[in-house]
């Protein structure tokens, strides 16, 4: 992060239990609240401090070369997967996890990315 944090103005905040690092842009949550997501702070009241400012995360995988992997948050994983397949993408795998429904896709040019639908365990967050 010594390179990217100052380059993009990110703050790197370690997550609990070795789960990686949250990348924050200070004030991003306030920007979202003022523009497209007025209820963001109320919805995330139980989240870690500054969670509304999170723009990504970083996890270092042992024995894997450094690379970027992009995850797009979507409203409906299955609809997004169906659209991607119709446009020529290949589904590499999908998983339903505690907080998300994810699918790893390969676009027609060969780039891999994930689509992720937020699904809190209690159904509302």
Across the structure, where does each feature detected by a protein language model lie?
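Short, small/polar residue-rich loop motifs at catalytic or cofactor-binding pockets
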Residues: 98-100
């Amino acid at each position: 992060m010594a390179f990217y944090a100052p380059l993009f103005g990110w703050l790197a905040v370690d997550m609990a239990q070795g789960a990686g690092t949250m990348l924050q842009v200070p004030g991003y949550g306030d920007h979202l609240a003022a523009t497209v997501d007025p209820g963001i702070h109320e919805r995330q009241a139980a989240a870690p401090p500054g969670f509304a400012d999170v723009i990504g995360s970083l996890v270092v995988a042992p024995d894997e070369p450094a690379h970027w992997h992009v995850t797009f948050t979507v409203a409906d994983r299955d609809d997004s997967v169906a659209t991607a397949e119709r446009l020529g993408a290949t589904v590499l795998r999908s998983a339903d996890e505690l907080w998300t429904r994810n699918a790893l896709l390969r676009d027609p040019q060969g780039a891999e990315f994930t689509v992720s639908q937020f699904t809190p365990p209690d159904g509302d967050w």
